[in-house]
Amino acid sequence: MVFPPEAPFRFLNLNVLLGMTGVSFDQIDNWHGVDPKDAFDLQFCLEGRNCGTTYKQYHSVKSELDYQPNVVQLRLGERLNFEGRWPAYQIRYSQPEANLQLSMDFDTWDGFHWWVYIPKIYCHYTSFGSCRIKWQWNDDEGTIESPALHDHGWGRNLLPFRLPLNVFRYEVLRLTGGGFAISLWTEAPGRLELKNTGLLRWDAHQYQPMEHYECQVLEWEYFANYAGQKCRVPRRWIGKQNSNAGEFTYEAERRTDPRSIMGDGFLYGFDYQGQWSGSPGRKIEGEGYVEQLGRYFH
């Protein structure tokens, strides 16, 4: 989720991955258990205005994870508890080493949801909703309620090909008024485009599907990923989403350090200023975050 500007945080991202994904950072050498299929990867980032905290660690599905088949219920010791039933979910997260406690209650909005499907390879389903967060971090505590996203889906393990995606870029922008602009751009090796799509969700009721996303990088920097490999990371870029109804164009600048919890790629926050050319036209500015995977991002 991307927080409102008056909040003490920029964004929060919590990922739960079951099984090895097969990209270059996610190999048996990094898994110390017996069976790689037993891997449970927990990724977390809470980016504050002045500081942040992250977590990335493999756990064992068999020995550490409590879950119930055919229902939404996951428990990883005292660190994570995720449960609920459509349309409401409850998440409890604890990071004792950072003196952090979070309690999150997510209520799904009615109506439209965003679905991205690559046959036999990938499925990504986004639910939109409101999330009430009660937090305690060191000596500070508080409660925030804000629009949020719940992404869930599956991806086929492509490990036999030994080739990671050339690009996986997932952007989430908070729009004026609490809506979202989201985009997903994926490329296979050889710059073969797999899926490129987007969406403007103005509020709980209005939305505009977008057909294509473009990214023109204006300035690069280099950072080491989770595997210690040097990767190019955009510092400034121009993003563009197109549709028959109009064009959303914005210039963005990264405002946080790239967090390497995603292994082959990074998670980072940015500010942006943009323009929607459709009817009615409007200027849009705010904050967002990126999930970027792929060493060969061009």
Task: Specify the residue positions occupied by each region the protein language model found.
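Structured soluble/peripheral alpha/beta segments that form catalytic or ligand/cofactor-binding pockets
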Residues: 1-298
